[in-house]
């Protein structure tokens, strides 16, 4: 293995921008694998609602960090950071070109920038109390103790809201005060994918999710883990659950899911521009542009 810092390629972008399809084409060209950096695709049985790469796509190119835990067992950033770094180091040992793809800015930067992540174990009693308060009250608490985190976490994301409160109450420090601890000794190229027609893509993908069976997938998760499974607060699953309990129609669920996803995508784009500043790819031919940039980086 070379004594020089290993090269690592990163592809980031908002949800529904087409990262999965482009990443597979890039991986095929450079004969490498994909490390999926996503806070929801790590869970089993959550395929449709997380837009997980299909079985066919996963057969075409090997994807790491998918389906590594049951939805009942939340994985925090610290745990994901450790699992991902170990997997990436294994690729480097094999002289493979690590290729990281995802839209979860915090998870990605915990790996590429070496963010220090508080090693706070789950506080079951505290979590129970917070669960009883409900998401709206928990959000109010988070706005008071860690307002910066509320700009990075989706209002409906009960899991991450409780985790941020948990870190604050245990350490006395806001989760948003994470600092760079020790960036890995990698030479990193960050590419960004952002589509001009993102709203239309989100609406179309949302319709496809409901046509493809997110309601059945949600029903399966409920039957296996219970109606109050925290991860079901994820955009799309929450709306599908509301259809199942007759609190919403399918049309309303599609509209609300798309609206929330558009809002989430805006926050992702803001994060990437402020925290990452990648080389944004040409929308007309992102594959050609990516290949040119990567080959130049590797030469």
From Swiss-Prot:
Site-annotated residues for Interaction with substrate tRNA: 104
Highest taxon in the source lineage: Bacteria
Top EC class of this enzyme: transferase
Entry EC number(s): 2.5.1.75
Organism: Prochlorococcus marinus (strain MIT 9301)
Subunit composition and interactions: Monomer.
Required cofactor(s): Mg(2+)
Region (Interaction with substrate tRNA): 38-41
Family, as annotated: Belongs to the IPP transferase family.
Protein's GO biological process: tRNA modification
Reaction catalysed by this enzyme: adenosine(37) in tRNA + dimethylallyl diphosphate = N(6)-dimethylallyladenosine(37) in tRNA + diphosphate
Taxonomic lineage of the native organism: Bacteria, Bacillati, Cyanobacteriota, Cyanophyceae, Synechococcales
Protein role: Catalyzes the transfer of a dimethylallyl group onto the adenine at position 37 in tRNAs that read codons beginning with uridine, leading to the formation of N6-(dimethylallyl)adenosine (i(6)A).
Residue sites binding substrate per the record: 15-20
Entry-linked Pfam families: IPPT
Record has Nucleotide-binding as a keyword: yes
Name under which the protein is recorded: tRNA dimethylallyltransferase
């Amino acid at each position: 293995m070379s004594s020089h810092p290993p090269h690592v390629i990163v592809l980031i972008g908002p949800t529904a921008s087409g990262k999965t399809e482009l990443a597979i084409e890039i991986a095929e060209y450079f004969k490498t694998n994909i490390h999926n950096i996503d806070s929801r695709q790590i869970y089993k049985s959550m395929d449709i609602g997380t837009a997980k790469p299909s079985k066919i796509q996963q057969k075409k190119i090997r994807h790491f960090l998918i389906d590594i835990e049951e939805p009942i067992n939340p994985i925090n950033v610290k745990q994901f950071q450790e699992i991902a770094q170990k997997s990436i180091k294994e690729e480097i040992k094999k002289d493979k070109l690590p290729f990281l793809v995802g839209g979860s800015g915090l998870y990605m930067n915990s790996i590429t920038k070496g963010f220090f992540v508080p090693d706070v174990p789950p506080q079951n009693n505290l979590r129970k109390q917070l669960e009883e308060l409900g998401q709206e009250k928990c959000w109010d608490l988070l706005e008071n103790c860690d307002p910066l985190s509320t700009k990075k976490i989706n209002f409906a994301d009960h899991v991450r809201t409780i985790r941020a409160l948990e870190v604050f109450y245990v350490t006395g420090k806001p989760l948003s005060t994470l600092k760079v601890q020790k960036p890995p000794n990698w030479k990193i190229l960050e590419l960004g994918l952002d589509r001009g027609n993102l709203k239309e893509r989100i609406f179309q993908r949302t319709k496809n999710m409901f046509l493809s069976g997110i309601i059945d997938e949600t029903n399966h998760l409920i039957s296996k883990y219970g109606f109050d499974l925290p991860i079901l607060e994820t955009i799309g699953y929450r709306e599908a659950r509301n259809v199942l309990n007759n609190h919403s129609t399918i049309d309303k669920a599609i509209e609300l899911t798309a609206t929330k996803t558009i809002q989430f995508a805006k926050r992702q784009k803001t994060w990437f521009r402020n925290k990452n500043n990648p080389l944004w790819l040409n929308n007309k031919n992102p594959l050609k542009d990516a290949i040119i940039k990567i080959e130049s980086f590797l030469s």
